[in-house]
Swiss-Prot record:
InterPro entries: Anthranilate_Pribosyl_Tfrase, Glycosyl_Trfase_fam3, Glycosyl_Trfase_fam3_N_dom, Glycosyl_Trfase_fam3_N_dom_sf, Nuc_phospho_transferase. One of its GO terms (cellular component) is cytosol. 5-phospho-alpha-D-ribose 1-diphosphate binds at residues 82, 85-86, 92-95, 110-118, 122. Anthranilate 1 binds at G82, N113. It comes from Pseudomonas putida (strain W619). Catalyzes the transfer of the phosphoribosyl group of 5-phosphorylribose-1-pyrophosphate (PRPP) to anthranilate to yield N-(5'-phosphoribosyl)-anthranilate (PRA). Pathway: Amino-acid biosynthesis; L-tryptophan biosynthesis; L-tryptophan from chorismate: step 2/5. This is Anthranilate phosphoribosyltransferase.
């Protein structure tokens, strides 16, 4: 199906099949469509609302065209990632949580990008921490295999996305592409915590990942609007495990955490996020640092469970709490900085 035929269909609020969506996405991602056509397609899909078949088709093409990271093994390799767009400007919880996971013995293939609507994306934070981002897929694989953690800078692995960059920027609205990033990890992880900007997306994205072969995934959205587990409100979870999807709410108290306001956790820039994370993963001298530490524990605990490194959410949170207090997570961040610095010298020689 070509994009003109697809536009005729979606204007009539008719869904595309998975294969039809693959056809259109390949045309978009290989530069065969005009910016006007891409913009019209994205807006039409938004107004119609994307079906599960359409998302599966789009994700499969993005994965097919990605510059992939090859790992020695994918057993238990996990990613913790969010769509962004929640408007809260909270510090980089999922990125900080990744280092707790690695310190706990998990293997983490973290996928992320620069901020679009927020104040600090995962790439912005890591750059502020002195971590070199412009790695080849092979170099990222060496980080993950050697240290148990590596960062895949989305723009380096999804170069075909450049064809949609202009229309997305000009539209200035959330589109299909906002939900594709967390679903297109270049290492092909089968274990994830995926935070989304709307509760309505939780079940559909869990079904998408089920169809694409994921093993254990938590798709989450908190009642106070975050694309992650919240200390201040219940969090809705669509969990894919053993090829079955269950849906439930989780209160902080269910996991041994105290409900509390998120006041003091919003940041204005990557440096502020880094300082809060340094405090949270280090000595926690401030009230906000302690609160940030608990937010990290909550989300890292969920990812330990998704990685099958813990038997339950509660067990994951307990393990994350113990690991965070050792200081090993901050050491792991510094290790990654030193490891990538060697690649920077190689790449810039």
């Amino acid at each position: 199906m070509d994009i003109k035929s697809a536009l005729s269909r979606i204007v009539g609020h008719l869904d595309l099949s998975t294969e039809e969506m693959r056809d259109v996405m390949r045309q978009i991602m290989t530069g065969q469509c005009s910016e006007a056509q891409i913009g019209a397609f994205l807006m039409g899909m938004r107004m119609k609302s994307e079906s599960i078949d359409e998302i599966v088709g789009a994700v499969s093409v993005m994965r097919e065209l990605a510059d992939k990271v090859e790992l020695k093994s994918l057993d238990g390799v996990v990613d913790i990632v969010g769509t962004g767009g929640d408007g809260a400007n909270i510090f980089n919880v999922s990125t900080a949580s990744s280092f707790v996971l690695a310190a706990a013995g998990c293997t983490v293939a973290k996928h992320g990008n620069r901020a679009v609507s927020g104040k600090s994306g995962s790439a912005d934070l890591l750059e502020a921490a002195g971590i070199y981002l412009n790695l080849t897929p092979t170099q990222v694989g060496r980080c993950i295999d050697s240290l148990g953690i590596g960062f895949m800078f989305a723009q380096s692995h999804h170069s075909a996305m450049k064809h949609a960059a202009g229309p997305r920027r000009d539209l200035g609205l959330r589109t299909l592409f906002n939900m594709l990033g967390p679903l297109t990890n270049p290492a092909g992880v089968k274990h994830q915590v995926v935070g989304v900007f709307s509760q309505a997306l939780c079940r559909p994205l869990a079904e998408v990942l089920q169809r694409l072969g994921s093993k254990h995934v938590l798709v989450v959205h908190s009642k106070d609007g975050l694309d992650e587990f919240s200390l201040a409100a219940p969090t809705f979870v669509a969990e894919l495990k053993n090829d079955q999807i269950s849906e439930y709410w989780v209160e902080p108290e269910d996991l041994g955490m105290k409900s509390q306001s998120l006041h003091g956790l919003a940041v204005e820039n990557p440096q502020a996020s880094l300082e809060l994370i340094r405090d949270a993963l280090g000595r926690r001298k401030t009230e906000n640092g302690q609160k940030a530490a608990e937010m990290i524990v909550l989300n890292a605990g969920a990812a330990l469970y998704a990685a099958d490194h813990a038997m339950s959410l509660k067990a994951g949170v307990d393990l994350a709490h113990d690991v965070l207090h050792t200081g090993l997570a901050w050491e792991k961040l510094q290790e990654l900085g030193a490891f990538t610095a060697v690649f920077k010298v190689e790449n810039e020689a």
